[in-house]
């Protein structure tokens, strides 16, 4: 009999989540015969994504899931299939999925997204440069923002896992790309390593003025991971027929009250500006094409990615908190066993 390790949500976080919001639990792995469309997975990699913090809140009308108190924490995970009643994911295959902070996980693949990992790719790569955040950036830019060569594209959270990929795709498509990040070190990385045209340190002064100075011809596409004051500053600089891509609102994830949205709404009306949110799941049928194109860009050296890989199932809550402190460098992943590095 296997022992299943898991982290459950003990209480609703108030502000940034802390270790005491969670409880470690071990139990004997017992489950009845799998129902049709279910898989049993041994998880080896856990993605620290900011949106998990939303799921820890009480149910609301925001359309995202709410984790029940006493239930395992929802998360994006990667692992190997041990049992299956879904022909798409046979025993021995590897998958990424919406699972839980559990070592062993039973998932209904008809309800939660499950994606096969191709041979030749380890689980780190599947969760990093070809993972959920990177693919989200791809569709946010190409399907929602739709930048044209020569346009100016502004990206908030540009040094983060999703923002850094979005910014590079903008460059690949021929845009002048400006990234917003916190601190000179991250701004230098955006310019010197990723090849962005300019970077703005949002801590270094009036952001509306900084955007105006750095984007003298205005902003055509704004890829937003942050919301709040940064979104407002971008709206003040958006061009006619501009597009605002709402990918995340990390400025408000730890707030007890909703962060105020844009106030200059008539600029949207008179500027024919479009603001749109989206989910990766909206483009499920287009994933093969996206993976092929991104793999080509990576091979050509046009798309770079960095992963911040940590270890230890017991450390998951502590490591997860770093995503909001900005102390991670790249996509923050937690590896719990060596199967994470297998390519078959």
Regions from the PLM with identified roles:
Residues 102-103, 182-190, 207, 259-265:
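Short, glycine/polar-rich helix-capping loops at beta-to-alpha or helix-loop-helix junctions
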Residues 229-303, 337-344:
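Glycine-rich phosphate-binding loop and adjacent beta-alpha segment
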